[in-house]
Amino acid sequence: MVTLSPTGASVPTTLNRFFEKLSSQQTPALIWYSVNGERIELSGRVLMNWVDKSANLLVEECELEPGEDFDLQAPLHWRTIVLGLAALRVGALLNQDEPLVAAVFTEQEAGYTNDPAYLLAVDRAPLALSYTGDLQALSSYADEVLDYCALVRSFGDQYSGMLPDDSAEVLEGFTYAEAYEQALAQAQIYRTAGYALPSGQRALALELSPDYAFDASEATMSALLEVLAILLSGHAVFVADPSVDWQDEQLASLMDSERAVEIPRS
């Protein structure tokens, strides 16, 4: 089921239906910039391919089921956004307390996890086919360490597992239905704001604030809700690597080239 926004665009009424709609979107959904001209652009369809591959990995390799605990301990990155959305796709509970699955980039981040059964080692490099760090160094932090980049491409492009129930919790005391309702409300604000470039052109993308990170369950939820809100508003998500010391003019030029704008914060 879908409803109509005031602009006439159809808006999926559940998270599962939103994912279905996103999978048919040919226009950009996620744009990532990092050092040395690194640029990743994912259409809605390609983003959902990555999300669904990751969700299948979580289910088939890590035995993650709806309601099972999942933890992200990593900075903002296009791959951590994918993994966070994959956890929602599966219906996981975002919880740091002895999660079944955790995901990290580094050994330092692994030290912040709490005895996961499975630890996903994720690499930052844009075209990494495997983890370039020391997998052995991560082995003391989990029962099993898995190389996310080496494994994820082998999984199906369409999610084949169980879909989450809207009444299930995504955080303790906070359901999937409540989370999606919050994302819809924020999306409506973004949709009606009429964001535009200084030239007057309509903005095609909104910047995901570099203040977001995946270092606590609540922080992960906040970041994912913002991603969902931007996508639901009809914009792409623009992410500039927060680990880079961007010069104002450099970042402004990148954003202008993508017709992206910063979301004003009160």
Stretches with model-predicted labels:
Residues 30-64, 157-214:
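Conserved AMP-binding/adenylate-forming core of the ANL superfamily
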Residues 4-13, 108-116, 120-202:
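Flexible, low-complexity linker/hinge segments
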Residues 2-5, 16-42, 48-49, 142, ...:
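Extended, compositionally biased accessory segments flanking or bridging domains
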Residues 93-114, 127-137, 141, 188-204, ...:
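Conserved ATP-dependent adenylate/AMP-binding module captured primarily in the ANL superfamily
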Residues 57-93, 97-98, 195-235, 239-241:
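Conserved AMP-binding/adenylate-forming
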Residues 13-23, 31-35, 45, 52, ...:
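Polyanion-binding and phosphate-handling cores
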Residues 1-26, 249, 257-258, 263-266:
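Actinobacteria-biased recognition of intrinsically disordered, low-complexity terminal regions
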Residues 1-11, 34-40, 46, 55, ...:
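Long terminal accessory regions outside catalytic cores
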